[in-house]
């Protein structure tokens, strides 16, 4: 009997992250992880890197790191996933915006990694899923999507078969217990990790999916690469009882099982959140006034952008440039971090809340500026929308 396990490392930094933090994380986490894979040819991971981080690595001079990731992907040691470029919480945005974020992510990562970037699987930011998100991911051409174990509604947790949704999208469920214990340094040596993998009393092969922020290794948990990851990569090739895989390799090995419609949730959703019908508590808690106003603010901004987009063809080049800047600012501004920092569960950071708010506000102002002079009625309508936007903004600022 063999336990097949796969690591999914999710690496991302918000587009408003400061350069000194990027540099620190590259040195503490990203580079050592990539080096450890190069030094262990039999080791492999599934990697989600959001396009905004790929761009940041390029902008800050880390092209060699991008190249090394691509080399490992070409060797089969890294399997890429798709995602939303700027890490929005997908269930909270309309389907056209979900499609746009997926498209932007594919274009950016393919530009930097080349044709080796051709993901079969999809990582929804924060593992936040809904039925609409699953439908959009399937229509976007992906074969599988990963989500938290709490999303599973079958009586049995899938470990010997691959569950699917109604559209035959393969559903991959994270083992939340082992993943969280790895992320919070409760599992920090090889023996402990292997013993946790062997939690089922069975004679048949099964699989375990571990997924966490890649920054866990070396940045959040300083010793995790030296004391856990490298020893694990040293140890696994010499064993017959466990096998390290990519997620797609696990899907190929195990048969298809029952279909289900997984529950809306994220990897931070707890049972008591679901009991109170709050599937995305760190980003849209009905009891959190900032979350409510942030969402209202975003929706007003989306309305302005979509309204301006209808007039793009009649804009002169200067106006088109202004609109394109507005569109890019909104793409960036709907990243999920600002809601996360407003959750106060337990994290709270007014600077990160305001940075995200500012990008959305700049997008809205530029959307209004882009409207041609010969359609004054539209400008007046946009001003009315912006008045309501500013009310939401004031509520956010006054509550900080």
Where are the language model's segments positioned?
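Active-site and substrate-binding clefts of carbohydrate-active enzymes
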Residues: 2-31, 38-40, 165-169, 176, ...
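Short, well-structured secondary-structure segments
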Residues: 3-94, 100-101, 120-124, 143-148
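Short His-Asn-centered micro-motif
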Residues: 123-127, 147-149, 173-174, 211-213
């Amino acid at each position: 009997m063999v336990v097949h396990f796969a690591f999914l490392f999710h690496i991302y930094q918000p587009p408003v992250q400061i350069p000194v933090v990027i540099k620190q994380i590259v040195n503490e986490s990203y580079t050592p992880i990539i080096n450890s894979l190069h030094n262990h040819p039999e080791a492999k991971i599934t990697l989600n890197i959001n396009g905004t981080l790929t761009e940041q690595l390029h902008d800050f001079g880390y092209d060699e790191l991008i190249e090394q990731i691509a080399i490992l992907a070409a060797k089969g040691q890294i399997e890429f996933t798709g995602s939303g470029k700027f890490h929005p919480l997908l269930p909270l945005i309309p389907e056209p915006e979900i499609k746009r974020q997926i498209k932007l992510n594919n274009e950016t990562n393919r530009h930097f990694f080349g044709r080796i970037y051709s993901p079969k699987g999809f990582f929804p930011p924060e593992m936040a899923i809904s039925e609409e998100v699953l439908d959009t991911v399937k229509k976007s051409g992906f074969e599988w999507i990963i989500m938290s174990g709490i999303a599973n509604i079958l009586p049995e947790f899938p470990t010997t078969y691959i569950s699917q949704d109604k559209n035959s999208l393969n559903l991959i469920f994270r083992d939340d217990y082992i993943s969280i214990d790895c992320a919070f340094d409760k599992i920090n040596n090889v023996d402990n990790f292997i013993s946790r993998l062997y939690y089922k009393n069975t004679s048949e092969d099964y699989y375990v999916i571990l997924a966490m922020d890649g920054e866990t290794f070396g940045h959040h948990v300083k010793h995790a690469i030296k004391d856990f990851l490298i020893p694990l990569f040293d140890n696994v090739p010499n064993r017959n009882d466990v096998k390290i895989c990519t997620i797609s390799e696990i899907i190929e090995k195990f048969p298809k099982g029952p279909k289900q419609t997984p529950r809306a949730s994220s990897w931070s959703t707890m049972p008591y959140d679901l009991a109170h019908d709050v599937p995305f508590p760190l980003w849209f808690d009905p009891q959190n006034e900032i979350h409510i106003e942030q969402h209202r603010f975003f929706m007003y901004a989306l309305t302005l952008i979509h309204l301006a987009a209808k007039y793009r063809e009649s804009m002169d080049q200067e106006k088109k440039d202004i609109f394109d800047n507005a569109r890019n600012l909104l793409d960036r501004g709907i990243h999920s971090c600002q809601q996360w920092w407003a959750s106060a569960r337990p994290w709270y950071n007014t600077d990160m809340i305001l940075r995200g708010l500012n990008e959305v506000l700049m997008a809205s102002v530029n959307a209004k500026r882009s409207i041609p002079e010969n359609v004054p009625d539209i400008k007046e309508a946009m001003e009315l929308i912006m008045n309501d936007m500013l009310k939401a903004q004031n509520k956010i600022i006054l509550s900080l």
